[in-house]
Structures are given as structure tokens and as C-alpha cells.
């Protein structure tokens, strides 16, 4: 495997340091064994998320100085609008403070209580907004996506038979829309093939069902299509992205990922009537339709960053840096979700902590142990993130119980990946010492963000 060098020069740095293990243990206890509640100053390598943790380019920082902070009609909005229209092909764009704001708008605009939203695996905040507006989420991802050890391409594809069955049983009129994530975060960052997007479009169009993409990591998805799908090897990333969105009615976007910024998002659509309603609604929750809760400078940085993300040298390095970490862990026998996705390496906590049951929260405990032993912050993605069933109150029990090692864009080097891998490999050698956890505080909504735990 050829791992390309960083396609950039580092112009500005932030000093970090490793605090002693006994201090890390104390900090973890104070945080209730929840890595979200740690203070960033106490973290050596922060792999909690790739959301908003990117390093911006010199051109983006220059653009920040050109912020038009008019309350209405900011020139930076029009730059962002033109950029998104050109690269994605959608007719309308509504800016939001981040992806969650776009999810909120779409859910209110598209869902009637009692309807269904089908998608290729749930995501935490997305499903929350869907359920909050009265929908029932139905997972129609291919079964292989739930098998951590199965190494096949495009595990994020929608199962067309499942989709057809849902249409037959519930009726097309009762399906609000299809939520197609590119890539599928909780499956390990797995991509969706262009063939599957095209087939989903054909099936839904025949039944009058809308398709909205979660476009957060669309550039990473495009890279996998170029790398692995026949007929796309000679197409540019921008060409692939444009074709991807030609099979959708709109999308939600968190700019904090593939737009290479620290804040921002947007909602896209082609429907004029929906756009008119969205402009009315965004004023209530975000701000004027020409800023959506963002400063002009942030919209400018987002427009520049989205275009930079289309550069092949950037996205090749980004994906292969993640793959480098995964390959090193796999070579040492550490169980990971395969194949390695575009934004993170997911440890398979079921196999890593096979002595713990799912009710002992193995992924949560593993994430806490990784911080204590290595100074690296990661994130639980298992039963805690899945939450509870709104009707029964029982835990959702995902087949995948993982810890996500999420790589920020243009922030860390291969040397950092070596440190992460070496620490986790060492921890794996005494994995039996990892103990189960229990709740001592469980929030009612999106509990993984602020819950607290203690050892059983």
C-alpha cells in the first residue's frame, strides 16, 4: 500500500502535551467515563470527531478576512450559493449553523406524523429530528453493513428488496422520504455505490417518493467510487459528486466535515415550494435565509473549503491516512470494522472486549480505557449512542458495538497515527482488564453526549 505524504505545508501549529497516566485516570473519573465530558487541554491526540476539527487552508483564512457581515444579502452567501449550485447541482440552498440545523428544517418540512423515513442505517441526531416530528425510522441498509468483519465494497448500499417491501407494506404515500447517507457513519464510514444511488432513484421515482442525501462526507464517498467502481476511474471527484446528487431531490450538509471548516451547514432542494417554506422556517430557528445562523466569514470559508475538498491529492491523502491507521491495527490483530471507511477507524468492541456483555457497555468502557492508557480521545458508537425505543423504553441494540477513532482533516501526521496504533495495540494485550460500566446519569435525549457512568 502506498501512503502518500501530506499534500500541504504546515504554516501554523498548536502545542499539545501528554499529562501523566494518574492524572488522566482522575480526569476520566471526573468526566463520568464519558469522553465527551473531557477538557480538550487534557487530551494528547483528539480523535473524538472529524466534525469542525479541521485545519483550514491559507486561502480559507484569507477568505475569512473578506467577511460581508450584512444582516441580509451577504455577498459571502451568494458565493456559497454559486459554489454549491455548481458542484452539487441543486437549485436552492438554505444555510444553517451546522448539519443539525438542516436536519431540523428538513424533518419539519417533509414529515407528517405517522409517516416513515427509510434510510441506510440510522444516525443519532438525524433519527432524533425524524422521530421528534412524528416519523418512524426504518433501516433498509444491506445486511452486510452490520457484519463488522466482512470486507466487501460498498457496504453502505440500500437493500432494494427491503425498500420495495416497505413500499408494498406501508404505501408510498406514507413514506416521507428516503434518507440516503453518503457515507454511512455508524457502519464504519462505508460508501454507497453510484449504481445503488441510481437504482434507488429509479425505484423511488416510480412511486413518487423523494430522496434526500445526508451529504456530510460526500467527497469521501466519491473517492471510493473512483477507486472501486468500474467506469469511474477516469472521472474527477467533482464529476462524481455532481452525478451522485443528480439522483437526489436535495440534501442536508454539515460543512464541518467535507467543507473543511469549523462551523456551518446547509439544506439543498430543487422543489420551489419546499424552498419557499424553508426560507420561512429558517428565520425562526437559524436566521435570515442569507446567513442561517452563520457569520459571512464562515460562509466564505465554507465555499472555499468545499472546492478544495474536490482536489484529488487532498482526498486521496485523507482516505489513505485513515486506512494507514486501520491497516496497522489489523496487522497487530486488533479487531476493527472492515473495510476501513473514509473518516475513521472503528474498533470492534464486541471482539475487543468479548468478556463483556452489551449491557456492560463495552464500547463506552473501551473508549474510557483508551484515554486513560494512551491520552487519545475516541468515541463510543454502540448501545449508548443508539439510545432507547420511544415506545417501549428498552435499549436499541445495534449489532455493531464500536469505538470510533475519527481523524480530523489536515490536522495530524502519520506519526500521530503510529502513536495511536501503538497505544491501542498495547491495550489490546491486556484487554481483560477492561471493566464494564453502568449509568449513574442517563439523559432522556441523545444520551451519549452528556451521560455519566461508573464501573459495575
Swiss-Prot record:
* Family to which this protein belongs: Belongs to the beta-eliminating lyase family.
Q: Which reaction does it catalyse?
A: L-tyrosine + H2O = phenol + pyruvate + NH4(+)
> Which HAMAP family has this protein been placed in?
Tyr_phenol_lyase
Q: Which Pfam families match?
A: Beta_elim_lyase
Gene that encodes the chain: tpl
Q: So what EC number does this one have?
A: 4.1.99.2
Residue positions where N6-(pyridoxal phosphate)lysine is found in the record = 257
According to the record's subunit comment, the protein's assembly and interactions are: Homotetramer.
Q: Which InterPro entries match?
A: ArAA_b-elim_lyase/Thr_aldolase, Beta-eliminating_lyase, PyrdxlP-dep_Trfase, PyrdxlP-dep_Trfase_major, PyrdxlP-dep_Trfase_small, Tryptophanase_CS, Tyr_phenol_ly
Query: Tell me, what is one Gene Ontology molecular-function annotation carried by this entry?
Result: tyrosine phenol-lyase activity
Entry-linked CDD domains:
Tnase_like (cd00617)
Give the organism, scientific name.
Citrobacter freundii
Q: Keyword Lipid biosynthesis: yes or no?
A: no
Q: SUPFAM superfamilies from the entry?
A: PLP-dependent transferases (SSF53383)
| Key words of the record | Lyase, Pyridoxal phosphate
Q: Which GO terms describe its biological process?
A: tyrosine metabolic process
Indicate what this protein is called per its UniProt record.
Tyrosine phenol-lyase
Write down the top EC class of this protein: lyase
Its transmembrane ranges are none
Question: Cofactors per UniProt?
Answer: pyridoxal 5'-phosphate
Amino acid at each position: 500500500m502506498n501512503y502518500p505524504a501530506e499534500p500541504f505545508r504546515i504554516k501554523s501549529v498548536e502545542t499539545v502535551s501528554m499529562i501523566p497516566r494518574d492524572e488522566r485516570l482522575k480526569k476520566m473519573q471526573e468526566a463520568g467515563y464519558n469522553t465527551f465530558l473531557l477538557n480538550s487541554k487534557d487530551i494528547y491526540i483528539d480523535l473524538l470527531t472529524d466534525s469542525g476539527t479541521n485545519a483550514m487552508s491559507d486561502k480559507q483564512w484569507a477568505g475569512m478576512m473578506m467577511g460581508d457581515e450584512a444582516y441580509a444579502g451577504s455577498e459571502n452567501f451568494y458565493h456559497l450559493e454559486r459554489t454549491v449550485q455548481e458542484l452539487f447541482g441543486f437549485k436552492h440552498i438554505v444555510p444553517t449553523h451546522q448539519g443539525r440545523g438542516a436536519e431540523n428544517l428538513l424533518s419539519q418540512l417533509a414529515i407528517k406524523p405517522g409517516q416513515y423515513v427509510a434510510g441506510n442505517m440510522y444516525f443519532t441526531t438525524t433519527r432524533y429530528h425524524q422521530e421528534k416530528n412524528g416519523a418512524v425510522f426504518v433501516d433498509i441498509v444491506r445486511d452486510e453493513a452490520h457484519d463488522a468483519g466482512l470486507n466487501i465494497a460498498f457496504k453502505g448500499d440500500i437493500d432494494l428488496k427491503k425498500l420495495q417491501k416497505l413500499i408494498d407494506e406501508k404505501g408510498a404515500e406514507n413514506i416521507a422520504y428516503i434518507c440516503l447517507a453518503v457515507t454511512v457513519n455508524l457502519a464504519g464510514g462505508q460508501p454507497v455505490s453510484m449504481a445503488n444511488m441510481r437504482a434507488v432513484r429509479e425505484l423511488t421515482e416510480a412511486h413518487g417518493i423523494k430522496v434526500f442525501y445526508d451529504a456530510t462526507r460526500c467527497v469521501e464517498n466519491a473517492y471510493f467510487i473512483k477507486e472501486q467502481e468500474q467506469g469511474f476511474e477516469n472521472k474527477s471527484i467533482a464529476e462524481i459528486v455532481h452525478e451522485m446528487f443528480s439522483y437526489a431531490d436535495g440534501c442536508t450538509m454539515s460543512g464541518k466535515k467535507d467543507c473543511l471548516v469549523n462551523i456551518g451547514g446547509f439544506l439543498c432542494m430543487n422543489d420551489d415550494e419546499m424552498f419557499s417554506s424553508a426560507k420561512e422556517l429558517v428565520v425562526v430557528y437559524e436566521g435570515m435565509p442569507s446567513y442561517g445562523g452563520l457569520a459571512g466569514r464562515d460562509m466564505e470559508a465554507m465555499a472555499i473549503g468545499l472546492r478544495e475538498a474536490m482536489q484529488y491529492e487532498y482526498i486521496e491523502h485523507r482516505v489513505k491516512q485513515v486506512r494507514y491507521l486501520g491497516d496497522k491495527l489489523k496487522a497487530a490483530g486488533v479487531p476493527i470494522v472492515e473495510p476501513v471507511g473514509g473518516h475513521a477507524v472503528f474498533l470492534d468492541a464486541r471482539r475487543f472486549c468479548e468478556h463483556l456483555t452489551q449491557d456492560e457497555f463495552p464500547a463506552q468502557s473501551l473508549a474510557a480505557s483508551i484515554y486513560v492508557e494512551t491520552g487519545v480521545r475516541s468515541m463510543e458508537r454502540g448501545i449508548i449512542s443508539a439510545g432507547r425505543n420511544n415506545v417501549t423504553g428498552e435499549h436499541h441494540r445495534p449489532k455493531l458495538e464500536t469505538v470510533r477513532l475519527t481523524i480530523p482533516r489536515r490536522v495530524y501526521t502519520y506519526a500521530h497515527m503510529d502513536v495511536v496504533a501503538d497505544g491501542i495495540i498495547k491495550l489490546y494485550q491486556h484487554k481483560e482488564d477492561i471493566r464494564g460500566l453502568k449509568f449513574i446519569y442517563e439523559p432522556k435525549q441523545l444520551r451519549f453526549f452528556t451521560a455519566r457512568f461508573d464501573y459495575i
